[in-house]
């Protein structure tokens, strides 16, 4: 929505009667026509509309620059308004009040020759701003006395601003009549610039970027030069050309012109000469020719075929839309309000349809931290939301840790629950203590019902923050005064129930000490003292004299709505139609092609149109109220055949027909001169002459097609662009067969002529188990001398483990590569039904992809298979659990949920009639009704009391039986427990005796073992002496040599194993690479290689996981019959030009040379599609080198000689190892008596097993469904009606008898006799 100056901002703009502004009496309400559209277009070829980049000079360069430029070929709008002595109120609103967006380019006419003598302004003033009030900056470009006065100030614009060509009229010394400021306003720029007053027109270039405003100027139709730039830090949203008030000179025509066209961010190609002057410019997205120039970065591109991607495929512009001039949300004002709630009564406020600046907000409240949940904090800046809700409260100093996500402290369990599933940000900030008053309020209604008072319970400390430690919920029947010793009207009592707070809820109530509740006067209700409310605590919020506050910012509807952050907000841009652009429409992003349409199906609150698939299909611009359709950008290839002598190229939209090209605005040309469909796609700007053939072609389009251009054809035929699409045939087939010779002779070859479907299964190993080795343990075991000498081998063991780790890493990397190849682009599916019967099973691909989804842990026997009553039944029924000694379940099975069968399902227990002791509400009502009826109308209704009597008696029997079983079980438990205690005591005695005997024997053996150890020490001392003698006799060199020999042998074996591991890993690496290659070439695509994916020509391949590898199933067609043909590797035409076949052979067929494919014999004529032209018929020969492997075997020395070299005689002295076994005391224990006693105790414990009578627990539902209540209600109504007429007819209701009138008179005699009969019968 566009904002008109005074109509929407009366507090900011000039007021009526201000001597600096025009009076309303000098205005009128005449309508004004729309701005005129120029016939002149923006011609950027000479640099018009461009500008010299600040602080940069380019010499003799052609380069691409991205900036804010007009669209080449766009038109101007004249926004100048002329007045004499009055202005029109309609001048100050759209379409003359416009959106500034990225910027504007203006061409302004110099009116010096038309203005009266003494005039100081030769063109209107332009103002650029947002609110045009004293709180925002406004850019003013105003002419005065041959200079340009540029100012950026916080002006207050008049209600009816204008530019006067002679401001000194009537003694008014003001420069301009457009602002009301008496005192100088706040300015960031005020400068004057020289103006060439003799120029025909002035050219201005205004744009904004990153909060900075840029102004450029020129006095001739060329590139503009830098005027000034100023950082404003805000977005300028609109501009206005002030009306030009002037009385022209006599006889002159006065028509001010202020031509304006919008700027957009686009790419231009510039050419700079040796002086750094722009000599030519090209808008890269304006035409196909300009796109080719930008692609080649040349103003004169050469002849060729170019693949276009900038304009037709990739977005080349941006359409950005936000609702303009929304009010500020003022979230910071609410966050910094003096009254701050406690966690117990946290507050929420929702903001919608407004803007906020998150950076300013954080600075304003002096934020300490900001953490976001389910969204990156950086993504909040610049986003739009449906609405924003903010919850805040003061934080007790000791409970800050409770506000961490997932914490279960007091603040989150009993005060405020943070919703971890919501998109939100948690803000911690502080306020000075003098600006904060804590509002401690208990929101509980049931606490206040019994006398809760905030100040009386919590106190009045300004910075104490109250929080609940536990919350309680109560039923409506709860009364804390229901005690026998307290006078109170309470008659029933239910206990409070502890509860946690849910998301968005407050604490339901604090705990109550019921002993402190009561009232001497029962008519004044139940009142609790202040000290009776418990379960809360308090702490100060102050840290360093600042109160800590928590705010939870809930972000609702991300990327939708009109509640936007202005931190990274861009200015609105023009809606560019007909090209592929990126768009951001009120937070909805994407890319597409816009086309303006007339649509009446948008409601006033609707802006976006979607299709049935949820894709954005249309858009209504709130700024201009125009409607657009949005089509997807063309994602194919566009080939442009460009000839340097032609003004435009011929186009080929590959793989797409022309109807789609023009219906989706892919082409820039709405009505091209000519176009047609070919088998390559849509051809534009060329004639269809594919029936003609050319031997030479400069613009080859592929597939044997050529674009030919002729300047003469374009000149003589006005309906032709000069391009034509023809067939490219570099030679004539008949000429080939007349003068052709085979290159390098003829060869016989068998070529397939018939095929069958083949099936091939293949396993490729891609991984193996990992191996690690403890090198020292493998070589030396636990031998210390060996380990010491092994150190001399250096890093051999370290290298072993390094090699094994390298092998393991290699296996891991190959496994990741294989998994990546499988997961990218492999569509896994089962075999489709094909009507072929037979034992063919679907392939199970689940091991390949693993378990996906929430059904992984569920099966038919899992949680999903559990069955029970429905949720509706659980809602309509209450559950009651009964002790069942054997008849409750049988009773329930008999009734089947029909409570009227109560007495029909009486059970028998040990000969006694019993019923379950619990009755539902409906059963109680029924039996009560029967008992009441029996008491009211005896003896006729006495029978109605029989069911009640029987029910009571049977249920009393049920209670008695249950109590009897429980009593018998209690006696059995007591008896068995006593027996068990006796047996346990006896078992402990026997165990104590046995342990005594064991102790004496163990002590004796310990002494004997001590003697044995002394003897062993002596013997092993002798052994050590002998070994020492042996080592002394052996030379140190010989001992090391023996150890070294063993180490060498084992290291050799280990080295061989490591070599084998390396070799195996190399094989696995090769096979894994082959598996990846087969996945990519066989599974994801169809290969042309023979016998690579199965046997024969590949059709289809499937892959499945297997232990340590992949299992492939290939389908291919295998040749079953062949023909023998004479083939040639090439042909020589006329002895100077050669031909080579493409993916096939040249064969002789009936004496004529033809081409056939290598996989199937099918002779066809030789064309450029199946052959390649060579410059000569020469053949190059290469001889392969002769390389042979070395087959010599090494000759090692004789083994016996090497053994004798190291063998030495050894002598050993055996030590005396005899032991004195006589000193060992071998004692046998006799524990038979103690074991028997323990066995008896165990037997008694076993006999104490309690065989209790089974008492089950049965769960029954006691509430009837709604339809049963309906039937009971209808029956009750019927009974009441019946009783009413009985009372009338028997005279029992005299009042009713009088009201019935004549209705009952005719039965009066009969009624009296019945009454007398009843009385007499009763008296008898």
Swiss-Prot record:
It is a single-pass type I membrane protein. Residues 970-1020 are annotated as: Heptad repeat 1. Changing residue 65 to A/H: No effect for infectivity on murine cells. Disulfide bonds join 21-158, 153-187, 165-246, 284-294, 329-354, 372-425, 384-564, 894-905. GO terms for cellular component: host cell endoplasmic reticulum-Golgi intermediate compartment membrane; host cell Golgi apparatus; host cell plasma membrane; membrane; viral envelope; virion membrane. Glycans are attached at residues 31, 60, 192, 357, 435, 530, 625, 657, 665, 688, 737, 754, 893, 1180, 1190, 1209, 1225, 1246. Residues 15-296 form the BetaCoV S1-NTD domain. Residues 1214-1254 are annotated as: Heptad repeat 2. Homotrimer; each monomer consists of a S1 and a S2 subunit. The resulting peplomers protrude from the virus surface as spikes. Cytoplasmic tail interacts with M protein. S1 interacts with murine CEACAM1, and weakly with murine CEACAM2 in tissue culture. This is Spike glycoprotein.
């Amino acid at each position: 929505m566009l904002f008109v100056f005074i109509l929407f901002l009366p507090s900011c703009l000039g007021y009526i009667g201000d001597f600096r502004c025009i009076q309303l009496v000098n205005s009128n309400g005449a309508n004004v026509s729309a701005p005129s559209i120029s016939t002149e277009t923006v011609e950027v070829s000479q640099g018009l509309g461009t500008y010299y980049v600040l602080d940069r000079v380019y010499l003799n360069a052609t380069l691409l620059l991205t900036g804010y430029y007009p669209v080449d070929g766009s038109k101007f709008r004249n926004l100048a308004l002329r007045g004499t002595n009055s202005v029109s109120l309609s001048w100050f609103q759209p379409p003359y009040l416009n959106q500034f967006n990225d910027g504007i380019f203006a061409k302004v006419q110099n009116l010096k020759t038309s203005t009266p003598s003494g005039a100081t302004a030769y063109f209107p003033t332009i103002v650029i701003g947002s609110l045009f009030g004293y709180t925002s900056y406004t850019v003013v470009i105003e002419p005065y006395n041959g200079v340009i006065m540029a100012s950026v100030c916080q002006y207050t614009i008049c209600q009816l601003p204008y530019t006067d060509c002679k401001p000194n009229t009537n003694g008014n010394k003001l420069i301009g009549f457009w602002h009301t400021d008496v005192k100088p306003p706040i300015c960031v720029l005020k400068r004057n610039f020289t103006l060439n007053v003799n120029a025909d027109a002035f050219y201005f270039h205004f744009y904004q970027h990153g909060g900075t405003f840029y102004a450029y100027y020129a006095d001739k139709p060329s590139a503009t030069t830098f005027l000034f730039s100023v950082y404003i830090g805000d977005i300028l949203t609109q501009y206005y050309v002030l009306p030009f008030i002037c009385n022209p000179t006599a006889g002159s025509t006065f028509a001010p012109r202020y031509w304006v066209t919008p700027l957009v961010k686009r790419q231009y190609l510039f050419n700079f000469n040796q002086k750094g002057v722009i000599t030519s410019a090209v808008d890269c997205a304006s035409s196909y020719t300009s796109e080719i120039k930008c692609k080649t970065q040349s103003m004169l591109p050469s002849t060729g075929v170019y693949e276009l991607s900038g304009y037709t495929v990739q977005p080349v512009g941006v359409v950005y839309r936000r609702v303009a001039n929304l009010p500020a949300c003022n979230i910071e004002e609410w966050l910094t309000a003096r009254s701050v709630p406690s966690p117990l009564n946290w507050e929420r406020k929702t903001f919608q349809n407004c803007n906020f600046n998150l950076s300013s907000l954080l600075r304003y409240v002096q934020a300490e931290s900001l953490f976001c949940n389910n969204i990156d904090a950086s993504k909040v800046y610049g986003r739009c939301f449906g609405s924003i809700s903010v919850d805040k409260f003061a934080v007790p100093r000791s409970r800050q840790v409770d506000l961490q996500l997932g914490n279960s402290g007091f603040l989150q369990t009993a005060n405020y629950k943070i919703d971890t599933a919501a998109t939100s940000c948690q803000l911690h900030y502080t306020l000075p203590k003098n600006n904060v008053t804590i509002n401690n309020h208990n929101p509980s209604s049931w606490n206040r019902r019994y006398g809760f008072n905030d100040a009386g319970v919590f106190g009045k400390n300004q910075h104490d923050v109250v929080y609940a430690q536990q919350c309680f919920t109560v039923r409506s029947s709860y009364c804390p005064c229901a005690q026998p010793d307290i006078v109170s009207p309470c008659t029933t009592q239910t206990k409070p129930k502890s509860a946690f707070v849910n998301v968005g809820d407050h604490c339901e109530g604090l705990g109550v000490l019921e002993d402190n509740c009561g009232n001497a006067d029962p008519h004044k209700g139940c009142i609790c003292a202040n000290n009776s409310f418990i379960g809360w605590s308090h702490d100060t919020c102050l840290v360093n004299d600042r109160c800590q506050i928590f705010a939870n910012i809930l972000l609702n509807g991300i990327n939708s709505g009109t509640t936007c952050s202005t931190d990274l907000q861009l200015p609105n841009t023009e809606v560019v139609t007909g090209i592929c652009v990126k768009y951001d429409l009120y937070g909805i992003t994407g890319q597409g092609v816009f086309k303006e349409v007339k649509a009446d199906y948008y409601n006033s609150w609707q802006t976006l149109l979607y299709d049935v698939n949820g894709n954005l299909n249309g858009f209504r611009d709130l700024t201009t109220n125009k409607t657009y359709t949005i089509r997807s950008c063309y994602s194919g290839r566009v080939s442009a055949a460009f000839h340097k002598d032609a003004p435009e190229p011929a186009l080929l939209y590959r793989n797409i027909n022309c109807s789609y090209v023009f219906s989706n605005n892919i082409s820039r040309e709405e009505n091209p001169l000519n176009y047609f469909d070919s088998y390559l796609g849509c051809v534009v700007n060329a004639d269809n002459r594919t029936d003609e053939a050319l031997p030479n072609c400069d613009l080859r389009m592929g597939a044997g097609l050529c674009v030919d251009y002729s300047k003469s054809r374009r000149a003589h035929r006005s309906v032709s662009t000069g391009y034509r699409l023809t067939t490219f045939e570099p030679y004539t087939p008949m000429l080939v067969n007349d003068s052709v010779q085979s290159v390098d002779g003829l060869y016989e070859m068998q070529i397939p002529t018939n095929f069958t479907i083949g099936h091939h299964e293949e396993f490729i190993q891609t991984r193996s188990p990992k191996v690690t080795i403890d090198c020292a343990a493998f070589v030396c075991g636990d031998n210390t001398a060996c380990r010491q000498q092994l150190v001399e081998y250096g890093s051999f063991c370290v290298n072993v483990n390094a090699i094994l780790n390298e092998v393991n890493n290699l296996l891991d990397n190959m496994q990741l590569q294989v998994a990546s190849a499988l997961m990218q682009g492999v569509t896994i599916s089962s075999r489709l039904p094909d009507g072929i019967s037979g034992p063919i099973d679907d392939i199970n691909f689940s091991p390949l992809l693993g378990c996906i989804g929430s059904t992984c842990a569920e099966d038919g026997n899992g949680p999903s298979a559990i069955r029970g009553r429905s949720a509706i039944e659980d809602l309509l029924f209450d559950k009651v659990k009964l002790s069942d000694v054997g008849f409750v379940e049988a009773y329930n099975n008999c009734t089947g949920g029909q409570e009227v069968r109560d007495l029909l399902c009486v059970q028998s227990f040990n000969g006694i009639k019993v019923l379950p002791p619990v009755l539902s509400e409906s059963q109680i009502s029924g039996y009560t009704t029967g008992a009441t009826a029996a008491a009211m109308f005896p003896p006729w209704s006495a029978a109605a009391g029989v069911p009640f009597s029987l029910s009571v008696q049977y249920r009393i029997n049920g209670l008695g039986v249950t109590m009897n079983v429980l009593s018998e079980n209690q006696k059995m438990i007591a008896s068995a427990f006593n027996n068990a205690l006796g047996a346990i005591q006896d078992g402990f005695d026997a165990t104590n005796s046995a342990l005594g005997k064991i102790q004496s024997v163990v002590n004796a053996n310990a002494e004997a073992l001590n003697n044995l150890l002394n003897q062993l020490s002596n013997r092993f001392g002798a052994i050590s002496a002998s070994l020492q003698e042996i080592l002394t006799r052996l030379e140190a060199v010989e001992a090391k040599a023996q150890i070294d020999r063993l180490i060498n042998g084992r290291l050799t074996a280990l080295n061989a194993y490591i070599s084998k591991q390396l070799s195996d890993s190399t094989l696995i690496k090769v096979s894994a690479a082959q598996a990846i290659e087969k996945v990519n070439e066989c599974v994801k695509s169809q290969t042309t290689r023979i016998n690579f994916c199965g046997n024969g020509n590949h059709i289809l391949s499937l892959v499945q996981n297997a232990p340590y590898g992949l299992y492939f199933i290939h389908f291919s067609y295998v040749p079953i019959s062949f023909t023998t043909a004479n083939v040639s590797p090439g042909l020589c035409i006329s002895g100077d030009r050669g031909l080579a076949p493409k993916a096939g052979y040249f064969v002789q067929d009936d004496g004529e040379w033809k081409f056939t494919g290598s996989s199937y014999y099918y002779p066809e004529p030789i064309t450029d599609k199946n052959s390649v032209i060579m410059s000569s018929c020469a053949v190059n020969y290469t001889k392969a080198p002769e390389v042979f492997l070395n087959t010599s075997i090494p000759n090692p020395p004789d083994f016996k000689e090497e053994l004798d070299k190291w063998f030495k005689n050894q002598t050993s002295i055996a030590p005396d190892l005899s032991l004195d076994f006589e000193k060992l005391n071998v004692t046998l224990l006799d524990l038979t008596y103690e074991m028997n006693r323990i066995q008896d105790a165990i037997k008694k414990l076993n006999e104490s097993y309690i065989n209790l009578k089974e008492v089950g627990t049965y769960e029954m539902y006691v509430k009837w469904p709604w339809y049963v209540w309906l039937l009971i209600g209808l029956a009750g109504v019927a009974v009441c009606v019946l009783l009413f007429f009985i009372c009338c007819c028997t005279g029992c209701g005299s009042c009713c008898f009088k009201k019935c009138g004549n209705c009952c008179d005719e039965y009066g005699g009969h009624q009296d006799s019945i009454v007398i009969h009843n009385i007499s019968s009763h008296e008898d």
